[in-house]
Amino acid sequence: ALWKNMLKGIGKLAGKAALGAVKKLVGAES
């Protein structure tokens, strides 16, 4: 079950990074 928690953590970090990238792109366009 420990690897599942690790995957969840990685998923959260990846999600935050993706959101940050999208916000940067939107901010650069506007």
From Swiss-Prot:
The keyword Ion transport does not apply. Keywords: Amphibian defense peptide, Antibiotic, Antimicrobial, Fungicide, Secreted. It is found in: Secreted. Pfam families: DD_K. Expressed by the skin glands. GO terms for cellular component: extracellular region. Belongs to the frog skin active peptide (FSAP) family. Dermaseptin subfamily. Potent antimicrobial peptide with activity against bacteria and protozoa. Also has activity against fungi. Probably acts by disturbing membrane functions with its amphipathic structure. Binds to healthy erythrocytes (this binding is receptor independent), but has very weak hemolytic activity. Does not bind to P.falciparum infected erythrocytes, but accumulates within the parasite. Kills the parasite, but has no hemolytic activity on the host cell. This is Dermaseptin-S3.
